[in-house]
Amino acid sequence: MVKCKLFFWLISWFLKVKNGEKVWKFLRSCPENCYSDPQFAFIGRSNVGKSTLINALANKKIAKTSTKPGRTQLLNFYKNESEKLFVDLPGYGYAAVSKTKKDQIDRIIAGYFQKDQPISAVFLILDARVGFTNLDYIMIEYIIKQGFKLHILANKIDKTNQSTRAILLNQCKKLKLNCLLISAKNKNNLSKLQELLE
């Protein structure tokens, strides 16, 4: 009986994957990296849509989202149907948190990006309406200095015009960084992002 249930569960899982339904799951929240497997890291300022992007990739709501910045304050780990790990890092630059909390978040981020971490690639997410900020430039310099592969994801392009998007792409070109314009909300260009995650 148990074998039959397992068989039907495996068939159901296979059909979900075959039909394009993402089989993602939340693993755990940690103040430091609690896994040694290769992983993709998502980082950005508070409220740029990191958690919304995780949900869009998973095709279901597995990450908690909020209109209030600073919701994510730990490392949140997820795994997809291919057993790949994804990490949603705390957002930086939110002024309305206490200095103690800000220092804690800074320590978590700095601790995660140590040179010996098993990070396959880092995706720094921007709010396309705002563009690059000084804090983004500092974070970009730090990640590159640590030797990690970096991609820029300009999110919320559904709320921008062609001129703003052209400026963003030109800024990325000057920085010599790969930049992808996306909308986690409308799922624009998520298929191109999926290719980078292969």
UniProtKB/Swiss-Prot annotation:
Keywords (A to Z) from UniProt: Cell cycle, Cell division, GTP-binding, Magnesium, Metal-binding, Nucleotide-binding, Septation
Superkingdom, natural source: Bacteria
Domain (EngB-type G) ranges: 36-198
Coiled-coil residue spans: none
Record's GO cellular component terms: cytosol
Gene3D superfamilies referenced in this protein's UniProt entry, alphabetically: P-loop containing nucleotide triphosphate hydrolases (3.40.50.300)
SUPFAM superfamilies xrefs: P-loop containing nucleoside triphosphate hydrolases
GO process annotations (BP): division septum assembly
Protein family per UniProt: Belongs to the TRAFAC class TrmE-Era-EngA-EngB-Septin-like GTPase superfamily. EngB GTPase family.
Functional note: Necessary for normal cell division and for the maintenance of normal septation.
HAMAP family, alphabetized: GTPase_EngB
Name this protein carries in UniProt: Probable GTP-binding protein EngB
Species this protein is from: Mesomycoplasma hyopneumoniae (strain J / ATCC 25934 / NCTC 10110)
Gene: engB
